[in-house]
A protein has these predicted regions:
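Short S/T/G/P-rich N-terminal loop/turn motif that feeds into the first structured element of a domain
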Residues: 1-194
Length: 194
């Protein structure tokens, strides 16, 4: 994969990350995730054209390695609703796959809670992403909490879940939100990120 992403063709693709799952309660057996991101939907669509191109097929060793060593378990199209790509490089993350029955109310409560989260002294970020198509059964949104390390993530979590802002968020969203899965992990490699 590294060979492809460092080729002239790979450098034409949008930024993406290779993410390794560490702990998960998901029912699927995925161990890694490839995640492409861009603010420009046309550029994301162009990625598909690259994979379907004759030039990509000329990279037979890469294609053959992928075919022989990777089993695609799931794929989805999502959109970042509240996220800062500048924080994607933080080294430890927990992803909460959730089912939200009232997205408007959830977004309002999330925005209020995030404002309190961002005022903390700790390093880290919290994001909200929408699952538009594909993905795991019942998951409509993903909340990602990132920190520089697992130790910092746990310390920040233990502190923040006791705050009034988090308690109000949890109480407000509980009637229309179900957490379906949690997954921890870390980015292994970023490509085409400036």
């Amino acid at each position: 994969w590294d060979q492809f992403m460092n080729s002239a063709l790979g450098k034409q693709m949008t930024p993406h990350a290779v993410f390794e799952y560490v702990n998960t309660n998901s029912t699927n057996s995925a161990t890694h995730q490839l995640c492409w991101f861009s603010d420009d939907p046309a550029k994301l669509e162009a990625n598909q054209g690259i994979f379907a191109s004759a030039k990509f097929m000329e990279l037979f060793p890469v294609v053959n390695t992928y075919i022989n060593n990777v089993t695609e378990i799931s794929n989805y199209m999502g959109q970042s609703l509240i996220a800062d790509p500048g924080d994607f490089n933080l080294r430890f993350s927990v992803l909460y796959g959730i089912n939200v029955q009232d997205p408007v109310s959830y977004a309002g409560a999330f925005t209020k809670m995030k404002a309190a989260f961002d005022k903390r002294e700790s390093t880290g970020t919290i994001e909200l992403h929408e699952i538009i198509a594909g993905g795991e059964q019942g998951i409509t949104h993903v909340v990602i909490v990132r920190a520089p390390s697992m130790a910092e993530w746990l310390s920040g979590r233990n502190e923040f879940i006791q705050t009034k802002a988090f308690q109000e968020f949890a109480a407000a969203t509980r009637p229309y939100t179900d957490v379906i899965q949690t997954t921890s992990g870390r980015p292994l490699q970023f490509y085409n990120v400036q």
